[in-house]
């Protein structure tokens, strides 16, 4: 098994530990296994093991696990802070100079040195291209202003909220979407003090409601300050719903109440009332006092043929 495959295997186990808290007794052994592996910057980038170890450190209560996790993260950060190693160009230049000095002694040695330097130059150019690609990838991933934030999960959630706030036109005089998104994410994080599933579900519900094209009022009220970040962080789905959805829910509630009233009271059959839907005179009606005592009673009618219901006073 290669180093990269071994790191992937350990990363999966640690991710499960950090998410559901199971298997914490194996955390120390896994960290020690990582300490023995020869992990380079390429493996760190592909496996994202650094983020996983950091999440495990936050969720663990074992001092030894926390200390070893900090040590690993500190060692891996040196890959980012260390200066670029000597490129093959420098070594090829030295080899070229030594070969040039000995060129007068042997023509064949000069030819071999020139071929070696040519290979070194091609390898150095390919390595520089790879570094440029990695640099462009890392810069695109960190395009969102983190504001000192180091938690990758929280940064990603802020990006999602900012994207939702940018939908449609931003009213003049309102805050910047990135700043408003950071403020909202911070308010949600303060509710849970971690990035578990409850935190992520809260983020998803805010993103869905802010992106809803039928609910521009919520987005506008938040951007203009009518609704604060703390209020939006605690709102229920009913409170975030659009006016149209609130009216629809109110209508459904009233209809359900009426249906329940008709179902609980045994009606009186009559052929005096005609159904407007099927035109037949096979109905059952009830009379209930739905308003004040001095007002006439409301008659609820149900057609026994087609199930159509209506009421009148």
From Swiss-Prot:
Bias-annotated ranges (Low complexity): 91-117, 136-148
InterPro entries reported in the protein's UniProt record: TF_IIS-typ, TFIIS/CRSP70_N_sub, TFIIS/LEDGF_dom_sf, TFIIS_cen_dom, TFIIS_cen_dom_sf, TFIIS_N, TFSII, Znf_TFIIS
GO cellular component: nucleus
SUPFAM superfamilies the record matches: Conserved domain common to transcription factors TFIIS, elongin A, CRSP70 (SSF47676), Elongation factor TFIIS domain 2 (SSF46942), Zinc beta-ribbon (SSF57783)
UniProt keyword tRNA-binding, yes or no: no
Region of interest (Disordered), residue spans: 83-150
Residues involved in Zn(2+) binding: 275, 278, 303, 306
GO-annotated molecular function: DNA binding; zinc ion binding
Pfam families: Med26, TFIIS_M, Zn_ribbon_TFIIS
More info: S-II binds to RNA-polymerase II in the absence of transcription.
Protein name listed in UniProt: Transcription elongation factor S-II
């Amino acid at each position: 098994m290669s180093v990269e495959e071994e790191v992937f295997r350990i990363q999966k186990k640690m991710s499960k530990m950090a998410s559901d808290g199971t298997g914490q007794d194996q955390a120390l052994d896994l960290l020690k296994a990582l300490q023995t592996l020869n992990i380079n910057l390429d493996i760190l980038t592909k496996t994202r093991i650094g983020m996983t170890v950091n999440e495990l450190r936050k969720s663990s209560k074992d001092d030894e696990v926390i200390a070893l996790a900090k040590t690993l993260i500190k060692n891996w950060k040196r890959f980012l802070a260390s200066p670029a190693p000597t490129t093959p160009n420098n070594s090829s230049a030295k080899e070229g100079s030594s070969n040039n000095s000995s060129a007068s002694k042997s023509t064949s040695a000069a030819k071999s040195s020139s071929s070696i330097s040519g290979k070194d130059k091609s390898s150095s150019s390919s390595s520089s291209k790879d570094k440029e690609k990695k640099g462009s990838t890392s810069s695109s991933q960190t395009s969102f202003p983190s504001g000192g934030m180091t938690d990758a999960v929280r940064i990603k959630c802020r990006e999602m909220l900012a994207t939702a706030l940018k939908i449609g036109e931003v009213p003049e005089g309102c805050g910047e979407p990135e700043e408003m998104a950071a403020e909202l994410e911070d308010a949600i994080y303060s509710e849970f003090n971690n990035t578990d599933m409850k935190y992520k579900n809260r983020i998803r519900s805010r993103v869905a409601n802010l992106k809803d094209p039928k609910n521009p009022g919520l987005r506008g009220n938040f951007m203009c300050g009518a609704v604060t970040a703390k209020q939006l962080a605690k709102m229920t789905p009913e409170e975030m719903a659009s006016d149209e959805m609130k009216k629809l829910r109110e209508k459904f509630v009233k209809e359900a109440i009426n249906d329940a009233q008709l179902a609980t009271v045994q009606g009186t059959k009559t052929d005096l009332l005609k159904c407007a839907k099927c035109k037949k005179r096979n109905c059952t009606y009830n009379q209930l006092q739905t308003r004040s005592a001095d007002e006439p009673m409301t008659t609820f009618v149900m057609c026994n043929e087609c199930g159509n219901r209506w009421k009148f006073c």
